[in-house]
Amino acid sequence: MKLFGSSGIRGIANKEITPELALNVGLVLGSRKKTAVIGRDPRVSAPMIEHALIAGMTATGCAVTEIGLVSTPTLAYAAREYECGVMVTASHNPSEYVGIKLWNPDGMAFDSAQQEEIEKAIEDADFSLVPWNLIGKFEEDGNAIRAHMNMIKKLVGSSSLKVVLDCGCGAGGTITPYLLQELGCEVITLNAQPDGHFPARNPEPNDENLTMLKKAVVDFGADLGIAHDGDADRMMAVDEKGNFVSGDEMLAIFGLYECSGKKGTVVVPVDTSMMVGDSLQGSEIVRTRVGDVYVAEGIKQSGAIYGGEPSGSWIFPKISYCPDGIYAAAKLVEIVKEKKLSELREELPRYATKRGALPCANDKKAEFMEKVKAKLEPLGKVLDIDGIRVEMDNGWVLVRPSGTEAKVRITAEARENVDEIFDMAEKIAKEALK
């Protein structure tokens, strides 16, 4: 039984993710943990799933503390005082989705071995209900947001910048506006009222969805704009000119400051731009599979000082292995206090990137990738942890099967003549599909 993807258990509410499934997850988890903390994002279906999880955990003897509507990084930080954390969220997915993400006390999401243990136990009904007098204690705690804010305030300096903050009607509205105000910022909020229908925009904080934020930054003469997804584990930005800052640019900017004055290891996924490595001269770049869980595992294994992925997940292991969009927002404000965001962007190297996709049936992907690997291997240094990435003198190309669609994706980046690299890879891919 496969339940977990790269972002925990996730699917459409009452179709793929049901109260029965949540109850079973709770029963299995409660049989293995003595204490747990649980929270939720503002999705309409989140309380339903949360209550089922609580019922399962307490029925098997686990003491559960409920912290209410919170961001995922707030929940992951709270988990440090429990044996595990449980977050009901579907992150950046649309409103009909819901999910369950499980956290270790160090802020690391459950790894593959832990996930497989849960899946097998559900399949085998490997749990036991406790007698009435051993049912787990249930309590509520309203202090998690304040504790998270206090931790960040100890690590980040104050600032008087004017910031436009688009919370996307997500859980970030419970913490980021208040944190930035307490740090001294003038904060103008957009979509700060949590609403599980996400009426203002799609929860994913990408360039296409942040039209309102880009305009507001210019109209209000703000120093920068900040945006979250539904559970605020992600954070993206807009510079003072109203231009969206790409994920690769954000990776490089944070990396420059985290690595300032010292050499260190930075962990990024395989689809990350050369911009990051070229900006962080002297630092070791470690590449992982795409997904913040894999980046976090890479950080822990390598002892890296920072990592993230261009979708908006920034991980600072000195505070947690969970991507923390709240801390990242405060940190970016501290950085921009010293230099404008547009100027920071201008200092980064720029390379041409080209992306495309080809249809490929899911049951043909493995055979396709073997053929592509054989053709690409002689062309450069190969990394095959997630698709096939080939690094050449002039750039790199990545051929990677989609995890959600019947497609294969091709990404090429080059210092010059990107079309040449892309066309070469596309030709090889098309031949492999025959």
From Swiss-Prot:
Q: Which cofactor does it need?
A: Mg(2+)
Q: What is its EC number?
A: 5.4.2.10
Q: Which residues carry this modification: Phosphoserine?
A: 91
Q: Where are the transmembrane segments?
A: none
Q: Which GO terms describe its molecular function?
A: magnesium ion binding; phosphoglucosamine mutase activity
Q: Cite the active-site annotation.
A: 91
Say if the entry is tagged with keyword Phosphoprotein: yes
Q: Which keywords, in A-to-Z order, does the entry hold?
A: Isomerase, Magnesium, Metal-binding, Phosphoprotein
Quote the catalytic activity from the record.
alpha-D-glucosamine 1-phosphate = D-glucosamine 6-phosphate
Co-factor note (free text): Binds 1 Mg(2+) ion per subunit.
Q: How is it modified after translation?
A: Activated by phosphorylation.
| Binding positions (Mg(2+)) | 91, 229, 231, 233
Q: Which Pfam families match?
A: PGM_PMM_I, PGM_PMM_II, PGM_PMM_III, PGM_PMM_IV
* Lineage: superkingdom: Archaea
Listed GO biological process terms: carbohydrate metabolic process
Note the HAMAP family from the entry: GlmM_A
Function of the protein:
Catalyzes the conversion of glucosamine-6-phosphate to glucosamine-1-phosphate.
- Which family does the similarity line name? Belongs to the phosphohexose mutase family.
Q: Which NCBIfam families match?
A: Arch_GlmM
State what protein this is by name: Probable phosphoglucosamine mutase
Source organism (scientific name) = Methanosarcina barkeri (strain Fusaro / DSM 804)
